[in-house]
C-alpha cells in the first residue's frame, strides 16, 4: 500500500478524528462493537474497540487480506486507552530472510515466547491513556537474529480506545512531535 510512497518522519494509518478513520482498515466484530465515541478524559473523538472475546473483535490494516502495508519505518506508535480489560495487538513484519514474522503483545500474558513465525510477549499498560512505542527493528533482531525490512500488517484487538496509530523513523520527544500527534489531556482546574 505504501511501498511506493516516500517514507520519512511520520506515517499515520489511523487518526480517530479524521473524516473516515477506518478507511484503509477492515473490521471484524462478534459479541462487541467498534464505534467512534467522545472520551471524557481528553474530550475528543476516539475509536473504541470492545468485545467479550479479544480474538473475535478487531480492526486490521490493510483492509484487503491480499495487500500489505509496505511501511519501512521501524517504530510503531499507538496512542491507546487502557480499559482495564484484556487487550492485544499484532504486527506482521518481513525480515531480510524473506520470512513473515508476527509479534503479538497482550496485557494478559506473563512470559515471552518466541516461535519460528510468531513472538508473543506481555505488555503492561498504565491507567488511562498510553503511548505504546514498538521498535520493530530491535524486536526482529532480538527475537530472530534477522533484520527488519518492512511492516506488512497491523491488527488491533479488543479492548481499547484508539486515538492514533502511526509509524516513525525514530523515537521523537514530546517537544519534537507535530501538534496533531500529541495527546492533549485537558488541564484540571484545582478549585479550593
Curated annotation (Swiss-Prot):
GO terms for biological process: cilium assembly; determination of heart left/right asymmetry; notochord morphogenesis; positive regulation of cell motility; positive regulation of feeding behavior; protein polyglutamylation; regulation of cilium beat frequency involved in ciliary motility; regulation of heart looping. The keyword Nucleus applies. Pfam families: CFA20_dom. The keyword Cytoplasm applies. Its main location: nucleus. GO terms for cellular component: axonemal microtubule; centriole; ciliary basal body; cilium; motile cilium; nucleus. Disulfide bonds: none annotated. It comes from the Eukaryota. Disruption phenotype: Display curved body axis, short somite length and defective heart-looping orientation. It is found in: Nucleus; Cytoplasm, Cytoskeleton, Microtubule organizing center, Centrosome, Centriole; Cytoplasm, Cytoskeleton, Cilium basal body; Cytoplasm, Cytoskeleton, Cilium axoneme. Keywords: Cell projection, Cilium, Cytoplasm, Cytoskeleton, Microtubule, Nucleus. Cilium- and flagellum-specific protein that plays a role in axonemal structure organization and motility. Microtubule inner protein (MIP) part of the dynein-decorated doublet microtubules (DMTs) in cilia axoneme, which is required for motile cilia beating. Involved in the regulation of the size and morphology of cilia. Required for axonemal microtubules polyglutamylation. Plays a role in cilia stability. Belongs to the CFAP20 family. This is Cilia- and flagella-associated protein 20. It comes from Danio rerio (Zebrafish). The lineage of its organism: Eukaryota, Metazoa, Chordata, Craniata, Vertebrata. The gene is cfap20.
Amino acid at each position: 500500500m505504501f511501498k511506493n510512497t516516500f517514507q520519512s518522519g511520520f506515517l499515520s494509518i489511523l487518526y480517530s478524528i479524521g473524516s473516515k478513520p477506518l478507511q484503509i482498515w477492515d473490521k471484524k466484530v462478534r459479541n462487541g462493537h467498534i464505534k467512534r465515541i467522545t472520551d471524557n478524559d481528553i474530550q475528543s473523538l476516539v475509536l473504541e474497540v470492545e468485545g467479550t472475546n479479544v480474538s473475535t473483535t478487531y480492526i486490521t490494516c490493510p483492509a484487503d487480506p491480499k495487500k500489505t502495508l509496505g511501511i519501512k519505518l521501524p517504530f510503531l506508535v499507538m496512542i491507546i486507552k487502557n480499559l482495564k480489560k484484556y487487550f492485544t495487538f499484532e504486527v506482521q513484519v518481513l525480515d531480510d530472510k524473506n520470512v513473515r514474522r508476527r509479534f503479538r503483545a497482550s496485557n494478559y500474558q506473563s512470559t515471552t515466547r518466541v516461535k519460528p513465525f510468531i513472538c508473543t510477549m506481555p505488555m503492561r499498560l498504565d491507567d488511562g491513556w498510553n503511548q505504546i512505542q514498538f521498535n520493530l527493528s530491535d524486536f526482529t533482531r532480538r527475537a530472530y537474529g534477522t533484520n527488519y525490512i518492512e511492516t506488512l500488517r497491523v491488527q488491533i484487538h479488543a479492548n481499547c480506545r484508539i486515538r492514533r496509530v502511526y509509524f516513525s523513523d525514530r523515537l521523537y520527544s514530546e517537544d519534537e512531535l507535530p501538534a496533531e500527534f500529541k495527546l492533549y489531556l485537558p488541564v484540571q482546574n484545582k478549585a479550593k
